[in-house]
């Protein structure tokens, strides 16, 4: 009773009342200025997350969270400096220094989301998501709008080797109901993916981001980066395709380069499937348009992970290019080349399949 009495007194303050009401119905502030990135540059998408959360925190998003002892790598350092650590001496801090404790991080964020008034996020390497998995599954069951920012989303982790390189993870998290798995293909699409995650009210999201720099696409030549809201869209079209390439995230540029190499003799359509869950929610007319191609077309998937599951789109006779073993230690580019995740290797596999 005393607490409620004190609250009612404080609600007489106009600014406090405004903040209180906003915390009870969290939404993206109207004055947010989203970062934008210049076409033709190369940027690691993990850097986008840092820019996004710093902007949101500075505009009163009631954002709380942090990294499992990987602040520099997850690019949450700037957020931590801006909002300060929560501690026994600073209860107003909004950065949670979780330490190397992925499951407690997930469980703590679930509790915050259940209580309401704050929008929680957690960050670590994608390969360590499995430590957090029981909490992720529970939040999907409970329809909690929590976000997990997972960086180092593929074998491009590099020298840390197979213990740090996610292989089976993408498909295993796509298997959890009521969970958005967003894997943007460039920096501007990463901004849009982050927006989508923060707009969710009754389900959690994973935002999967690269360690390595990848090209920023010219959206005057390609569809708008907010097309990821459809989950899947035609990245590069053609008439009467002989070949259709499906890809996500950092493999989109590989697909587009491969198309260029094939274009002299083949018509190639490239489809970006950055979020399978959102794509499945689209109307049948839209999905049928994206997935429109002759029955004779060769269907190809490219993704830096296991290929099981891609048959949903490529069929029994398709060509699924990925990694069905654990990774290797070495520079990211060298590891990708070893596993054939580059345009020349993909081109060669497609030509072999067509023979």
Which stretches of residues belong to each language-model region?
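Thiamine diphosphate
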Residues: 2-355
